[in-house]
């Protein structure tokens, strides 16, 4: 068939000449063609169509033709393939086809189709498929049973015919009896196990030949026993049992010669059996005498006296039952002969009709007690051969039983508990089968996507009903804890602790901080030099004291302080600008001042007015002093080498030192006394000390205590900054305390009366000379060093151990700072 997709209608049209109106095969030749097409088909569509064609065909000849040409074997191959692939629809179709075919036992033996179907009926996961397989198995079992029963029945018929021919001289029976026996035989094979008991009956019939002489002897004795009511069977049977043994002995002797005559028939027991049931009239009398010994044996097992009476009336009323009972008893009457007892178990005729013969076969040895067997005989007769059942009640104390169970809340019920081993085995088999099929199915799985992925729709979940941590007190405790504990920083994953608990406290010994002296031990001065007490030059503008200035204004005010004009005499325009910037805000923060919309415009205007003032207005001073250039705001002016500075009153001091007042003492380094401090950036520092002013010899000067009485004069330059560790002269203007050599009492200084010197030396007024010290040790490389290479130690560490003796450039120390 083609490799492309197949249209079922086209396929059926191609088979139109073979098929009838209902889709069935019309002729035998057509079935052969269908079989050839089935062998070549590989697609599921083709196979299903062909299976349906076979299902629609109902002619037994055509179906038999299909089986003969090999259709049954082909279905076996398809069944194996479908079971391997776990194709349930195909399996269902194949099972229906197998159920439709007229299979025989020989066909079922050809391959393992029956075995596969039986496995499907037990282990299939599909419930419908399992039921269908079970029905098919039951149908096949019925076929097997019917055929196996028919075959032995035919064989028995042949044997019976031969036996009847051989036994005809012994028996005077007519051919009608044989035909009746054969009819009985035909009926008996339907019940498989009735054949053996029928033989036992026939044995009893063999005894029936001479039963006429036995009948008159035993009839009178058992009849009165049977006529008695049910309540008095025990004594009657005991009486009857006494004469019975005497009668039974001659009867047994008579039976023996009868049995001996047809010894050949004994050897072939089956042959003797058929004629005996016909002669039931005379045989009943013999049975009445025979059952007593047989029943004795049974009674040994069950000694029940009260019900024995009921047995006798039933015996007389039902001759057929009596005959069945006599058959086992007849062989027993001969206690000395064991051969008869051996024959008894082989005659289970009553076993089918009555369950007694099983008991009869077991108890043959105990024959001595004769009274008990008679009672048992009566009991069995009353029950029609059924076992006696008794009803009893327990004692009153045991009528009620109470069971107390305590509730265990922790107890768990195992719902999946397996009830029995059968269920466990079935589950295990299903699991193994599923695992095997999965392994085979996934062995060639290429893991390709078969079902396309579809993005699931979004779920609209309701909002949280409870706000997490809304009433939590732990978060406040955690916040308080974090306020007193430093944050732990982990630089690597290995340093992260396993648990979030607090780290172990580190053990350390607190040590007092080291005190680093700012002066040498030999220095005698203590404390910081107090600021000047002159409050005459307080700034006039309240805005300079009232608020913190922004950095721009602070630099501006610092430049104004270093300008040639007095700081307290501001131009009107500048005063108005400052008042407009700061007056309205009061004590506002600098950030708020800078947020004003026209802040930048006001600053530009202020700077412009200040520049014009510096250019057009010369500083007051002696004649010959020229005007200075624009003020450097926030940066020291470039140093001048080999330049003789003008007198201190007219030289513009560096930005680190405000110029002295017109009439007052030299102002402090932080601006005019009493004025706002920090009006500009502090002077550059080096290792925590003020930078020495440029253009100085660092050897004392006019501020160092005068000329020392003609010794070292006052041409040493400006004083060192405060707290600078040099050995210059100590004295000078009142705001500075330097170290230098105290001069002798010289001429009075320019600022007032003589100062006090150390060691009979006097300095200028207000300067206490501290004699006895050598010259300044830090000089040697003065002036601007910016032309030299930068000191790498100073750039890396921020300091240099050579300090001012270093031959390299220290930005901001021995030269201007870096841009």
From Swiss-Prot:
Query: So what does this one do?
Result: Substrate-recognition component of the PNUTS-PP1 protein phosphatase complex, a protein phosphatase 1 (PP1) complex that promotes RNA polymerase II transcription pause-release, allowing transcription elongation. Promoter-proximal pausing by RNA polymerase II is a transcription halt following transcription initiation but prior to elongation, which acts as a checkpoint to control that transcripts are favorably configured for transcriptional elongation.
Q: Anything noted about its domains?
A: The TFIIS N-terminal domain specifically recognizes disordered sequences in protein substrates that are then dephosphorylated by PPP1CA (or PPP1CB or PPP1CC).
The gene behind this protein is: ppp1r10
Which Gene Ontology BP annotations are present? negative regulation of transcription elongation by RNA polymerase II; positive regulation of termination of RNA polymerase II transcription, poly(A)-coupled; positive regulation of transcription elongation by RNA polymerase II; RNA polymerase II promoter clearance
**Annotated Gene Ontology cellular component terms:** chromatin; nucleus; PTW/PP1 phosphatase complex
Which PROSITE patterns does the UniProt record give? TFIIS_N, ZF_C3H1
Q: Which residues form the TFIIS N-terminal domain?
A: 73-147
| SUPFAM superfamilies to which the protein is assigned, alphabetical | Conserved domain common to transcription factors TFIIS, elongin A, CRSP70 (SSF47676)
In the record, what lineage is assigned to the organism producing the protein?
A: Eukaryota, Metazoa, Chordata, Craniata, Vertebrata
Identification of the protein by name:
Serine/threonine-protein phosphatase 1 regulatory subunit 10
Subunit architecture: Component of the PNUTS-PP1 complex (also named PTW/PP1 complex).
Q: Where is the composition biased (Low complexity)?
A: 606-618
């Amino acid at each position: 068939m083609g490799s492309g997709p197949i249209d079922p209608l086209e396929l059926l049209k191609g088979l139109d000449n073979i098929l009838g109106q209902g889709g069935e095969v019309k002729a035998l030749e057509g079935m052969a063609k269908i079989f050839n097409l089935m062998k070549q088909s590989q697609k599921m569509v083709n196979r299903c169509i062909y299976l349906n064609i076979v299902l629609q065909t109902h002619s037994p000849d055509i179906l038999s033709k299909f089986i003969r040409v090999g259709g049954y074997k082909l279905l076996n191959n398809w069944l194996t393939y479908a079971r391997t692939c776990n194709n349930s629809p195909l399996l269902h179709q194949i099972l229906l086809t197998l159920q439709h075919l007229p299979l025989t036992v020989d066909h079922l033996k050809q391959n393992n189709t029956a075995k596969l179907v039986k496995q499907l009926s037990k282990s299939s996961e599909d419930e419908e498929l399992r039921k269908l397989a079970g029905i098919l198995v039951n149908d096949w079992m019925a076929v097997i049973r019917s055929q196996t029963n028919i075959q032995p029945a035919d064989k028995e018929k042949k044997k019976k015919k031969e036996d009847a021919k051989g036994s005809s001289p012994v028996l005077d029976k007519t051919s009608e009896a044989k035909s009746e026996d054969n009819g009985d035989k035909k009926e008996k094979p339907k019940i498989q196990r009735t054949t053996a008991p029928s033989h036992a009956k026939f044995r009893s019939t063999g005894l029936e030949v001479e039963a006429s002489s036995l009948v008159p002897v035993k009839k009178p004795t058992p009849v009165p026993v049977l006529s008695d009511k049910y309540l008095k069977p025990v004594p009657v049977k005991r009486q009857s049992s006494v004469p019975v043994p005497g009668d039974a002995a001659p009867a047994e002797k008579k039976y023996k010669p009868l049995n001996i005559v047809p010894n050949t028939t004994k050897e072939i027991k089956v042959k003797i059996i058929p004629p005996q049931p016909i002669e039931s009239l005379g045989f009943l009398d013999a049975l009445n005498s025979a059952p007593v010994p047989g029943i004795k044996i049974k009674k040994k097992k069950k000694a029940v006296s009260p019900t024995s009476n009921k047995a006798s009336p039933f015996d007389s009323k039902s001759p057929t039952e009596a005959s069945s009972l006599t058959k086992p008893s007849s062989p027993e009457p001969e206690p000395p002969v064991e051969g008869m007892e051996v024959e008894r178990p082989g005659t289970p005729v009553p076993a089918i009709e009555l369950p007694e013969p099983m008991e009869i076969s077991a108890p043959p040895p105990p024959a001595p007690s004769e009274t008990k067997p008679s009672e048992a005989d009566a009991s069995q007769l009353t029950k029609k051969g059924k076992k006696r059942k008794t009803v009893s009640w327990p004692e009153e104390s045991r009528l009620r039983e109470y069971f107390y169970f305590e509730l265990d809340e922790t107890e768990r019920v195992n719902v999946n508990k397996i009830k029995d081993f059968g269920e466990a085995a079935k589950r295990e088999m299903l699991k193994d089968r599923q695992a095997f099929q999965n392994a085979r199915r996934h062995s060639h799985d290429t893991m390709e996507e078969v079902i396309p992925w579809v993005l699931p729709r979004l779920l609209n979940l309701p909002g949280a009903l409870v706000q997490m941590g809304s009433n939590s007190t732990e978060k406040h405790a955690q916040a308080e804890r974090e306020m007193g504990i430093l944050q732990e920083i982990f630089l690597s994953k290995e340093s992260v602790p396993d648990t979030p608990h607090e780290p172990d406290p580190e053990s350390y010994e607190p040590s007092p901080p080291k005190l680093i002296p700012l002066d040498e031990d030999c220095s005698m001065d203590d404390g910081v030099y107090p600021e000047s007490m002159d409050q005459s030059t307080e700034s006039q503008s309240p805005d300079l004291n009232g608020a913190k200035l922004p950095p721009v204004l602070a630099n501006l005010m610092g430049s104004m302080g270093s300008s040639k004009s007095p700081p307290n005499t501001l131009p009107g325009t500048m005063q108005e600008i400052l008042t407009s910037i700061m007056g309205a805000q009061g004590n506002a923060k600098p950030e708020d001042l800078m947020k004003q919309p026209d802040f930048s415009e006001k600053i530009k205007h202020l700077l412009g007015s200040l520049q014009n003032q510096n250019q057009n207005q010369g500083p007051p001073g002696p004649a010959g002093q020229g005007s200075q250039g624009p003020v450097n705001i926030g940066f020291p002016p470039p140093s001048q080498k080999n330049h003789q500075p003008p007198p201190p009153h007219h030289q513009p001091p560096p930005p680190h030192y405000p110029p002295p007042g017109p009439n007052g003492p030299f102002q402090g380094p932080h601006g005019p006394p009493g004025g706002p401090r920090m009006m500009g950036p502090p002077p550059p520092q080096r290792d925590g000390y003020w930078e020495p002013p440029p253009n100085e010899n660092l050897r004392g000067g006019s501020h160092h205590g005068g000329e020392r009485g003609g010794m070292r004069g006052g041409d040493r330059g400006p004083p060192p900054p405060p707290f600078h560790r040099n050995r210059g002269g100590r004295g000078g203007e009142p705001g500075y305390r330097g170290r230098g050599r105290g001069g002798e009492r010289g001429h009075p200084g320019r600022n007032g009366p003589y100062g006090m010197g150390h060691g009979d030396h006097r300095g200028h007024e207000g300067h206490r000379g501290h004699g006895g010290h050598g010259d300044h040790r830090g000089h040697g490389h003065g002036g601007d060093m910016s032309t030299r290479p930068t000191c790498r130690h100073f750039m890396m560490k921020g300091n240099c151990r050579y300090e001012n003796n270093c031959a390299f450039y220290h930005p901001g120390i021995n030269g201007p700072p870096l841009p």
